[in-house]
Swiss-Prot record:
Species assigned in the record: Saccharomyces cerevisiae (strain ATCC 204508 / S288c)
UniProt note: domains: The MRH (mannose 6-phosphate receptor homology) domain is required for the ERAD-L activity.
Segments carrying motif Prevents secretion from ER: 539-542
Gene Ontology terms: biological process: detection of unfolded protein; endoplasmic reticulum unfolded protein response; ERAD pathway; retrograde protein transport, ER to cytosol; ubiquitin-dependent glycoprotein ERAD pathway
Protein name: Protein OS-9 homolog
Source species taxonomy: Eukaryota, Fungi, Dikarya, Ascomycota, Saccharomycotina
Pfam families the record matches: PRKCSH, Yos9_DD
Family: Belongs to the OS-9 family.
Amino acid sequence: MQAKIIYALSAISALIPLGSSLLAPIEDPIVSNKYLISYIDEDDWSDRILQNQSVMNSGYIVNMGDDLECFIQNASTQLNDVLEDSNEHSNSEKTALLTKTLNQGVKTIFDKLNERCIFYQAGFWIYEYCPGIEFVQFHGRVNTKTGEIVNRDESLVYRLGKPKANVEEREFELLYDDVGYYISEIIGSGDICDVTGAERMVEIQYVCGGSNSGPSTIQWVRETKICVYEAQVTIPELCNLELLAKNEDQKNASPILCRMPAKSKIGSNSIDLITKYEPIFLGSGIYFLRPFNTDERDKLMVTDNAMSNWDEITETYYQKFGNAINKMLSLRLVSLPNGHILQPGDSCVWLAEVVDMKDRFQTTLSLNILNSQRAEIFFNKTFTFNEDNGNFLSYKIGDHGESTELGQITHSNKADINTAEIRSDEYLINTDNELFLRISKEIAEVKELLNEIVSPHEMEVIFENMRNQPNNDFELALMNKLKSSLNDDNKVEQINNARMDDDESTSHTTRDIGEAGSQTTGNTESEVTNVAAGVFIEHDEL
């Protein structure tokens, strides 16, 4: 998977180049096997497994108890390939299936995107796609609640592509990559590129994704060559088409085929769980369970035996769930009750039952996402849901939305928890793939270095120059906050120096580097960390 690297401009770019992958999937720190479980009836089990010698040679049958049998492939074989080879499908049938999928997919695209513009904000730029009209890139701000553009800079608007006026002339293709099938549309007739002299163009990749009832969204936009772009648009309704429904986790999972036992012989177990929910692997032995019935709530499933004792929650639990929640947010799996996809800038209180592989309740997780782009994780078996509003107790869309209270959480703050003597630990995570923590750490390092080599007067000159010609909004905000923390420390240092030597001249506006180094030892590492933690970066600036 390709990850795009971005570099955020710092106070002195030569000293601290900051980098972070944009929406890069979080790798599972503990390698866990992933499985895709499918269920067939008695007749299919006999025909496709028991009486198919090539299949039987590729794996073995395991009795799972409760009249449940499953066929598991050997590590060196692929069950899907064997089953596909055993099915006699003609080339004409396969071609017909591909053609049908493409036609139905294109119809879905027109039905769901007709006369509706969608946008995607990536730092300085906003990308807006109005199907049948244009795909543009511009600088401005978006009211995430109303979808209205605010303060659009008309001098920074670039048309990346314009679809053909005649719908019949628009060209769609059904393509395949490492993840699965998607529908591709090439849109040309964009603005002339200053570098190449050619028209800008964009390929739009329509894929299955998002919440079952959520809106269509732009997942990412990237420039693959100069003035040539790719954009991925997720449309939940495309998941109703079999070829488009398979996601990356399913492709990488080891398939298991099980015989469906009679319902009367089984209770609540993994069959009920998997047939009611779509499992999406988040890493660290944790799955996001998305219900097929939209009236049901999302759940989190734990398959890691290391997280089986919920009466003694250790730091490992928080680390693994922190990684899993980060990936859940980056994949945009959570939808608000109004259909809005939860994204950076929103705040909410979100609850989810944590269950094991047999759908047995373990505890309840509370995810509290704050306006600061930080989030708190709480575990408590006594948390209660508001039955009318799914997983949410409250939510707020962006900075412009009004907070919508959906209910009250049991023991929702530390004071209540401590008074009631109920265990409900918290763990701080970051919703932007550790970018905030990395920036805070490197700001501390730069602040400490600048205190050693630059006088307060020289620091003021540097900041004044940056204020006059800042490279972007992020740098301006970063500079102002760093300046504030540096000034506070410099004032303390000046007072200490005055007390140590009343006779020392205060008329000098510069210091020798060697002298500065000897005078800054009063800043301990803990002090630097505390100052860095106070540096706050709003989402809009990122």
